[in-house]
């Protein structure tokens, strides 16, 4: 099964990326995911279910530890491939 994750971390800082946002970006970019798109107001990535779920676990743990007060995410099934 293939999944797509969309997420944001808060609090926002329009002047520079806060530590929790940098950590979240590093987690997603280091994961074995496809179609990673990192932006200032939202991020998306796609991949196999195991890879996405592992990345989401790390994303939540590490961004909260780095100061995020809120993490909003959505996970969608986008296909049956690996």
PLM region spans:
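Charge-rich, low-complexity N-terminal segments
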Residues: 1-82
């Amino acid at each position: 099964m293939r999944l797509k994750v969309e997420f944001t971390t808060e609090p926002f800082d329009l002047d520079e990326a806060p530590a929790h946002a940098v950590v979240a970006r590093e987690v997603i970019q280091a994961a074995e995911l496809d179609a990673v798109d990192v932006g200032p107001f939202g991020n998306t990535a796609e991949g196999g279910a195991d890879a996405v779920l592992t990345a989401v676990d790390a994303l939540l743990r590490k961004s909260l530890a780095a100061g995020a007060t809120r993490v909003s995410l959505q996970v969608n099934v986008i296909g049956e491939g690996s």
